[in-house]
Amino acid sequence: MRGRRRAWRGAWRGGGAADLSLLCPQVAYVRARELHTLEVTGLETVAQSKAHVASLEGLIPEDKVVLLAGSPLQNEATLGQCGVEALTTLEVVGRRLGVHNV
């Protein structure tokens, strides 16, 4: 694997339905400029995860979109609602023209 790996443990308790299979912290990967290892429960929102990675890399979260298998994720959705499972790789990329509300 390329780049630094940083473990991060999400501790948010947001509302809404969650995938119960992720209630025990599991590892997910986030690729931005570097590859980061995140410990997630599935209750973290996409916006919270994006903001955390942006702070690690000095990025502006509002200028970024989180992708799962090439599809943009909604900021207010939890990772569990988006189908993030153990060992899932998310990508944080620059926002493209025409991509709104994510």
From Swiss-Prot:
It comes from the Eukaryota. Residues 23-99 form the Ubiquitin-like domain. SUPFAM superfamilies: Ubiquitin-like. Pfam families: ubiquitin. This is Putative ubiquitin-like protein FUBI-like protein ENSP00000310146. It comes from Homo sapiens.
